[in-house]
């Protein structure tokens, strides 16, 4: 089973890396760039889980390891 955990900064949290990427895109001539927010994506392969247990295990992993829940949100998706 494949799953994805996407971690993003919460609204209102400053994102200096996103700002740097935004500036770099503009300096490269990419037009129409409004703002950029950076995040992390974890693609994880699991075995021995049904969908509900996989989601629960990944939410637990995100809470404890993958995301800093003070400043980040996360989304868990089971892909297949």
Can you describe what each PLM-predicted range is?
Residues 2-43, 48-80:
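Long, contiguous binding/interaction regions
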